[in-house]
Amino acid sequence: MSKSERRVFLLDFEKPLYELEEKINQIRELAEEKNVDVSEQLSQLESRAEQLRQEIFSNLNPSQRLQLARHPRRPSTLDYIQAIADDWFEMHGDRGGYDDPALVGGVARLGTRPVVIMGHQKGRDTKDNVARNFGMAAPNGYRKALRLMEHADRFGMPIITFIDTPGAWAGIDAEKLGQGEAIAVNLREMFRLDVPILCTVIGEGGSGGALGIGVGDRVLMLENAVYTVATPEACAAILWKDAKKSDKAAIALKITADDLAKLQIIDGIIPEPKGAAHANPLGAAAKLKEALLFHLNTLAQLTPQERKQLRYDKFRHLGQFLETAV
């Protein structure tokens, strides 16, 4: 991310760190221009910047993590695929006459393994987001995903899904094309597949849109991703008739990776680089690849029947909750 982009997309809680880093850069440039030794002062300021970065990113509240999950420069499905996989070949169409740019998928090689990778795809700018429907997949997107899953199962290739959507497309045309049925069929069929399935929430994990490619042997989350039954804004509008109470809803919904790990909804948290994934996309991709390879190696030791039974049991046992006052 360029310096100008960082300034444009700066989040409120990042401003103190940004201002300090700008001060460091200005002092460094001035010292070089005037040929003055300020190494000791720079060292002190850099130590302070590192301390401030640690303070900010180790004490994020749910709403702040939601902002990071929605950051316009957060790595997308295609960004991660290009960074971690080789021989990527995208496949299109649901074999019913439709394609969906909001959900991409294809075959690739992860390490030494051929795999099928799919995930929601948001845009980088307004035009791209409109073309990709802001990552909200239509029924044909979920049917395309199912076709790719069946392809993977037929050829014995593990399935990797990347979840990053505010929710499934809720337009009238989506209902006409059978949105609910498409997601429901995917849920049913993912329990039946013989091959290993790894699901990772890389940004927003929104409602049924996330679940449509979210049934796996392992469900992982990036450190600053969120996973929720409804957006905090929608929840606040429903419960309190006021979308401005979304901060309160974000706390009650338990949307963060830490909360969901405690509730055993997810199986693991993938740490992000300092400053979150958008600050260091390649560093985030390296940590993601490491986690995927580890879990693929673990799942490869099980028989298909063992994996399916564990997969079924995992989702049947979901349901822990914490009582809180809202």
Curated annotation (Swiss-Prot):
Checking SUPFAM superfamilies in the record gives:
ClpP/crotonase
Q: Which InterPro entries match?
A: Acetyl_CoA_COase_a_su, ClpP/crotonase-like_dom_sf, COA_CT_C
Q: Does the entry feature the keyword Cytoplasm, yes or no?
A: yes
Q: Where in the cell is it found?
A: Cytoplasm
> What would you give as a GO molecular function for this chain, any one?
acetyl-CoA carboxylase activity
CC terms in the record's Gene Ontology section:
acetyl-CoA carboxylase complex
Q: What pathway is it annotated to?
A: Lipid metabolism; malonyl-CoA biosynthesis; malonyl-CoA from acetyl-CoA: step 1/1
From the Swiss-Prot or TrEMBL record, give the protein name.
Acetyl-coenzyme A carboxylase carboxyl transferase subunit alpha
Organism the protein comes from: Synechocystis sp. (strain ATCC 27184 / PCC 6803 / Kazusa)
What would be the name of the gene that encodes this protein? accA
